[in-house]
């Protein structure tokens, strides 16, 4: 017989080896099960999208135009393309931006949104909420859960294509293009003046017109290198400062505000802010008009929205308003504007049904909400971008830790995120719901909606009224009269009134407390204006 100690070693080794194999097998099984959804994403249906129309709303309450991308336009554009070669991001496209096909994969999703999403119904609610802010929270909407097509956010080509659509909105257009009037109050004598301002929406469709994507143009900012031809700088800055500042860009007493809602130190009129955001000459109203026209042209299509910077924030607001899938790139935090506009938000919406995505990188100070303060580049350029909270989900590429980047405003450009971020990473960023966030925590926003219901009877008059027939000559500093005089005009009025009453009654005074008389005519306040004999 051999040594029993030597006999036990092989058995122990066999048991350990078996345990290791079991653990590895289970780990591989778990890994395979987790990877399964990703494999499905790569086999999801795809469609090739091309631009079909460009809508331009001048944000003046009257001008709205549509440009159809047809053979005539392409001929005009190609002949003038050499003059637009200086425009940034043109080289991102392999062919003309108006001829390139962009492949996007979609998948089946779920959402909870309004049962009635017609522009007339939604805008009527927004108008009501504007006048009755607190009362609008008591409205119970008819929500419904339904299936819809959403972009495959785990597919790299899809995200790159959506980013290229956002970049396409910055491309310059020929000045002699044939625009169609789709507004009601367009002045034909102003042929091209409206082109220098407003919002542009580029409309892409697939061949079957199953999905329509609206790309909203972002900020053309002088000194911020955000892209564009610079024609809308001032109007873009006004809307940026209105949407993303705490109170009308009131950073200090040296700043020129974009509205008159500031009351005192860190105190702002909430109702005034909401009124300013809904003005007809603001960008939010302009994108509502663009959406109205697109739904009229494509009533049966699924509509998505996308955009970069300001265009990304506007696309998120539009998506929240009508329950649309929205993908933004390097957008400023728009959660504060969402609440100020009283946009409908379904209660208790699960994270997987949140179909608003914000794509950005950690080296972009605007996307991260840190481009503020007296010494920041944004402040020096006149932009009060004080918000950092986003609604929906955030898909953040950590280029600071992964690639060693430094925070720089140049990393906000759409060109940077396409060529240096999206094209460099092999995998897409994970999209997660951000932690709880609160903007402008040190400000006090005053609601004055109850002031309209106050009457003069319920509030004391600052100066006491004089008694009949007397007139105050001198008052103390707190309003008490200490010198009186007779008021001839009051005596004359009393005499005339008494004379009128004598025609209908034998009582010589203007106060009727007895006799066979009755009031035959009263004011809307209930005071009797004319007395007469009692009817029997």
Swiss-Prot record:
Keywords: Autophagy, Endosome, Glycoprotein, Hydrolase, Lipid degradation, Lipid metabolism, Membrane, Signal-anchor, Transmembrane, Transmembrane helix. The active site is at residue 309. It is found in: Endosome, Multivesicular body membrane; Prevacuolar compartment membrane. This is Putative lipase ATG15. The lineage of its organism: Eukaryota, Fungi, Dikarya, Ascomycota, Saccharomycotina. One of its GO terms (molecular function) is triacylglycerol lipase activity. Binds to both phosphatidylinositol (PI) and phosphatidylinositol 3,5-bisphosphate (PIP2). Lipase which is essential for lysis of subvacuolar cytoplasm to vacuole targeted bodies and intravacuolar autophagic bodies. Involved in the lysis of intravacuolar multivesicular body (MVB) vesicles. The intravacuolar membrane disintegration by ATG15 is critical to life span extension. It is a single-pass type II membrane protein.
């Amino acid at each position: 017989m051999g040594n029993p100690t030597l006999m036990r070693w092989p058995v122990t080794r066999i048991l350990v080896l078996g345990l290791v194999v079991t653990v590895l097998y289970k780990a591989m099984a778990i890994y395979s099960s987790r990877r399964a959804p990703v494999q499905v994403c790569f086999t999801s249906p795809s469609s090739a999208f091309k631009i079909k129309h460009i809508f331009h709303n001048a944000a003046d309450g009257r001008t709205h135009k549509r440009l159809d991308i047809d053979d005539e336009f392409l001929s005009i554009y190609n002949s003038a393309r050499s003059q637009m070669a200086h425009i940034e991001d043109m080289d991102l496209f392999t062919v003309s931006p108006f001829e390139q096909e962009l492949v996007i994969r979609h998948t089946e999703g779920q959402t909870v949104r309004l049962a009635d999403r017609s522009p007339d119904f939604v805008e009527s609610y927004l108008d009501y909420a504007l006048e009755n802010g607190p009362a609008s929270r008591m409205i119970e909407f008819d929500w419904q859960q339904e299936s819809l097509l959403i972009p495959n956010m785990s597919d790299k080509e899809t995200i790159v294509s959506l980013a290229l659509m956002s970049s396409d909105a910055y491309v310059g257009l020929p000045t002699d293009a044939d625009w169609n009037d789709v507004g009601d109050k367009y002045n034909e004598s102003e042929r091209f003046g409206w082109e220098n301002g407003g919002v542009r929406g580029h409309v892409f469709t697939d061949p079957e017109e199953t999905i329509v994507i609206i790309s909203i143009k972002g900020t053309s900012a002088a000194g911020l290198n955000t892209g564009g031809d610079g024609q809308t700088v001032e109007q873009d800055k006004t809307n940026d400062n209105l949407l993303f500042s705490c109170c009308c860009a009131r950073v200090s007493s040296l700043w020129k505000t974009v509205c008159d809602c500031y009351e005192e130190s860190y105190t702002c009129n909430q109702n005034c802010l909401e009124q300013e955001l809904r003005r007809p000459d603001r960008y939010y109203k302009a994108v509502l008009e663009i959406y109205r026209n697109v739904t009229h042209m494509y009533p049966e299509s699924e509509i998505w929205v996308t955009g970069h910077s300001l265009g990304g924030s506007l696309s998120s607001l539009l998506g929240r308003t009508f329950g649309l899938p929205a993908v933004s790139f390097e957008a400023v935090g728009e959660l504060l504007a969402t609440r100020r506009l009283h946009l409908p938000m379904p209660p208790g919406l699960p994270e997987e049904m949140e179909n608003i995505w914000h794509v950005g990188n950690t080296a972009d100070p605007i996307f991260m909400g840190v481009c503020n303060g007296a010494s920041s580049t944004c402040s020096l350029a006149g932009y009060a971008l004080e918000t950092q909270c986003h609604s929906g989900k955030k898909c953040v590429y950590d280029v600071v830790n992964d690639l060693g980047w430094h925070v720089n405003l140049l990393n906000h450009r759409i060109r940077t995120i396409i060529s240096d971020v999206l094209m460099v990473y092999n995998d897409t960023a994970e999209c997660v719901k951000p932690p709880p966030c609160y903007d402008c925590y040190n400000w006090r926003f005053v609601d004055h909606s109850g002031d309209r219901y106050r009457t003069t009877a319920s509030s004391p008059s600052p100066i006491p009224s004089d008694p009949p027939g007397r007139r105050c000559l001198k008052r103390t500093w707190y309003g008490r009269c200490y010198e009186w005089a007779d008021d001839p005009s009051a005596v004359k009025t009393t005499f005339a009134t008494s004379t009128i009453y004598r025609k209908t009654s034998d009582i010589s005074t203007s106060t009727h407390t007895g006799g066979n008389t009755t009031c035959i005519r009263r004011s809307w306040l209930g005071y009797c204006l004319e007395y007469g004999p009692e009817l029997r």
